[in-house]
Amino acid sequence: MARKTNTRKKRVKKNIEAGIAHIRSTFNNTIVTLTDTHGNALSWSSAGALGFRGSRKSTPFAAQMAAEAAAKVAMEHGLKTLEVTVKGPGAGREAAIRALQAAGLEVTAIRDVTPVPHNGCRPPKRRRV
């Protein structure tokens, strides 16, 4: 029996001008997802996916690299303008936004959608270092 060759489907090039950048910045990692206006993902990247491990994952530089990688793939689909939604308290928030602008994408709006509890769950105890 002949063995099947492992062929990957070629990514279909979409022609999308405007989109949304979802930046999730936690204390441990930064995840950047670029979607069209309906929320269908065009590209994504994260500090961990780029090979940053441990404490280097949570740095602004790692967030910058993740944003650049996601922007590069999304611009191949024709993406030009972005609305940015930022969620979380992490270090890579501003760095990721600046990297998207530096990659050549026009940022039209920046929205902070960090969830704020109305006194929900008890937070973790304070660290003593």
Swiss-Prot record:
Highest taxon in the source lineage: Bacteria
Any one GO MF annotation of this record: structural constituent of ribosome
Gene Ontology CC entries for this record: ribonucleoprotein complex; ribosome
Biological process terms in GO annotation: translation
Segments forming a coiled coil: none
UniProt-listed Gene3D superfamilies: Ribosomal protein S11
HAMAP family for this protein: Ribosomal_uS11 (MF_01310)
Family: Belongs to the universal ribosomal protein uS11 family.
Name used for this protein in its record: Small ribosomal subunit protein uS11
UniProt source species: Bacillus cereus (strain G9842)
Higher taxonomy: Bacteria, Bacillati, Bacillota, Bacilli, Bacillales
